[in-house]
């Protein structure tokens, strides 16, 4: 089992429209920048036995007390965990149909990052 930590703020996959090809909304611009960063860093997700943890950054407006209470706790707000996973897999794979065993967790943290734990892939 390997564990890799990437200091990238997780971004969900937005709902795409036809206009997004030429008119970049802020949500789609963040998504395309995220995809480029993932490709640049060469992130890989094994097709089985993978646990992905998305560490969501806490808002700067939160007090130190609230930050301490939420550190490492479950992140039960938007963005949805399935949209975060979809964005990551779409950034890595042209067709992610061969990924068949994956577990995803979303927690609060001081900074945004993606932690991937899993078996070594044969690729």
Tell me the role of every PLM-derived stretch:
Residues 1-123:
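Acidic, proline/glycine-enriched N-terminal capping motif
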């Amino acid at each position: 089992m390997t564990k890799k930590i990437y200091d990238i703020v997780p971004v969900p996959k937005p709902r795409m429209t036809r206009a997004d090809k030429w008119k970049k909304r802020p949500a789609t611009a963040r998504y395309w920048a995220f995809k480029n960063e993932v490709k640049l860093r060469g992130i890989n997700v094994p097709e089985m036995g993978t646990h992905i943890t998305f560490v969501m950054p806490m808002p700067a407006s939160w007090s130190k007390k609230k930050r301490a209470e939420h550190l490492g706790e479950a992140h039960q707000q938007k963005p949805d965990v399935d949209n975060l996973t979809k964005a990551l897999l779409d950034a890595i794979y042209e067709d992610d149909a061969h990924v068949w065993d994956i577990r995803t967790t979303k927690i609060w943290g001081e900074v945004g990052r993606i932690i991937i734990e899993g078996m070594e892939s044969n690729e």
